[in-house]
Amino acid sequence: TANNYLDPKKHATKFIAVRYGNVLGSSGSVVPKFIEQIKNKKKITITDKQMTRFSITMNEALDFILKSAEYGQGSEIFVPKIRAYTISDIKNSLTEILADYGEEEIGIRPGEKLHETLINSEEIRYSWEYQDVYMITNPLYPMFNPTIIDETYPGIKKLDKFEQYSSDLVDKIQKNELKKIIEESDLLKTK
């Protein structure tokens, strides 16, 4: 496992990870699916109107990966400070831009969650806020004691403002802003 590589004296390779939710418009995501349904003059299929998801654009995701590689010392998980959207706002944004052929609520599929969690309640104990990211540290890694963390990451703060980082608890991207993001992207171009 990765824990076998924790001792920097034995292994020079540093592993870090990123978590960032849904990349807006990526393959298999809801926006291209909804656009296709509208272009085919079909009802939009919605699992649950209250469903929320974190959202990041492709450029934001790429910038975040590079920033995480720059910040990382080894074994951290980096999570961006991002907002979320409701599935209803995505649907309403697209129907206002394109057309409205109705909707059909199909229910949540087995294993699907109503809200997305990027830092769970267990991980919060080992999580920090650093500049514009959250950082989950590995409690087994010797360099992640509070003194060394303070020295390595100037201005870092223990993350204690919520019990978990979940898409239902963060600020939402409003419909007008979603429309602007969608219109400025390449998502509406015919393939």
What are these regions (language model features)?
Residues N3-K191:
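Strand-loop microenvironment adjacent to phosphate/nucleotide-handling motifs in alpha/beta enzyme folds
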